[in-house]
């Protein structure tokens, strides 16, 4: 799946041995009973190199900015597919690396009791690397 599929809580219809399964794409791995045998479904999203998703469905975005490029701006916009996470420049510290957290603004959390539940969202962690060049 794509990041857009994950953000939009898209489902995939899978056919296996004449059986049909509706797969929530924001899950990492699901196991279904397929005519007495376990059917393992792994959802491996297609992600850019600077983005990862952890076991709790939190998104981690790693970005690099030159201090000179952002100094005169009020915000920097960190893109994650179609989502945009604005960071106020005047809240940043002059350190090489820092993390800004966008609580409950990420993907749907995995609910093992109800795999289609999309009511709780994960967090987004933006790790900024500031440089002088």
Role assignments for model-derived ranges:
Residues 5-133:
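Intrinsically disordered, low-complexity linker/assembly segments
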